[in-house]
């Protein structure tokens, strides 16, 4: 299926916008009471820094962010007072400019996405606000600016955490009507899924099923770290750092995230897993913490300039030595989304 390019973004989109309230064009005053910037972890010798980048043309939240061939694709999400956005905004770090590409085929939110070579693969999402999960999945070819359907999920859900390992795509957790522990692998070459055993949620002496959504994922030395997230709502956040080894098809547990939260993003850069942003009851996090897999320890990094969430999974894009974080919500829930775009670097 070939789709026309998304309509050009309006030039008067504000830095922040309300999901249903068109009068919101800036961060509400209540945000100051909800910001949480600190960490109990020791401060890193090199805490890194944030650098402001050109803003998104359209404020967005609960979206997917994927690096593909050196460009940053921001796909779907809440925007322009709707929860069913088919937006596709692309940032070129070389020209420092945004453009609009072919619209996402099924407007929705909480979609998961990854890239392999010049193609982007997306999985699931919600049609309504955190409700009505769908099973549809798509592939985008950046060379032709076209979307095509691929095999759908056997179990519809949104807020999945997706990550590439050895040319295949692992889909972890998510939510249908409640959080789930599901783990499956999508093979792009065969267009097929393999369903694995559920995620683990605790230690061997205290096992329970590991239902989680809105968590961060990263690959280190051929293993997948699934960090933070929540069970059912942000009233039940966790700092769990569970590690999946594909060689044994088993889970182990490492030092937990010092600041439990959900709606985070995680990336592996500079030899560390960096986890930033997130939400909890009455809080939005600017907290930025890094995990060293060699020492099994955490340390505190420079907090985000504007705390926000809606970054679930690997919703950040690493280009060179910079982690780009476009969009996100500055208040818990989906009431406000942002056009803010900054990048973190250890340099």
Each language-model region and where it sits:
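Kelch-like beta-propeller repeat domains
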Residues: 13-347
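N-terminal export leaders
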Residues: 1-4
């Amino acid at each position: 299926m070939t789709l026309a390019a998304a309509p050009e973004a309006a030039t008067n989109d504000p830095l922040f916008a309300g999901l249903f309230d068109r009068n919101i064009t800036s961060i509400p005053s209540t945000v100051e009471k909800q910001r949480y910037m600190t960490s109990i972890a020791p401060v890193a010798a090199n805490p890194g820094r944030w650098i402001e980048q050109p803003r998104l043309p359209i404020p967005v939240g609960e979206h997917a962010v994927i690096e593909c061939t050196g460009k940053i694709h921001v796909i779907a999400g809440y925007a322009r007072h709707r929860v069913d956005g088919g937006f596709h905004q692309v940032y070129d770090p070389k020209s420092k400019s945004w453009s609009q590409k072919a619209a996402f085929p099924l407007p929705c939110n909480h979609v998961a996405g990854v890239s392999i070579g010049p193609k982007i693969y997306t999985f699931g999402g919600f049609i309504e606000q955190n409700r009505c999960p769908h099973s549809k999945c798509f592939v985008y070819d950046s060379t032709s600016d076209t979307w095509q359907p691929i095999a759908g999920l056997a179990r519809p859900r949104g807020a999945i955490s997706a990550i590439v390992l050895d040319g295949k795509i692992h889909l972890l957790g998510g939510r249908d009507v409640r959080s789930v522990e599901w783990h499956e692998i999508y093979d792009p070459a065969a267009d097929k899924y393999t369903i694995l055993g559920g995620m683990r949620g605790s230690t061997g002496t205290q096992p329970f099923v590991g239902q989680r959504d809105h968590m961060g994922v990263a690959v280190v030395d051929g293993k997948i770290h699934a960090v933070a997230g929540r069970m059912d709502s942000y009233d039940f956040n966790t700092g769990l750092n569970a590690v999946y080894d594909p060689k044994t098809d088993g889970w182990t547990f490492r030092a937990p995230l010092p600041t439990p939260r959900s709606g985070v993003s995680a990336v592996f850069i500079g030899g560390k897993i960096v986890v930033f942003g997130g939400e909890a009851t009455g809080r939005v996090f600017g907290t930025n913490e890094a995990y060293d897999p060699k020492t099994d320890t955490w340390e505190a990094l420079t907090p985000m300039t504007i705390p926000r969430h809606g970054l679930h999974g690997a919703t950040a894009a690493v280009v060179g030595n910079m982690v780009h974080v476009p969009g996100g919500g500055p208040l818990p829930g989906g009431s406000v989304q942002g056009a803010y775009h900054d990048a973190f670097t250890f340099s």
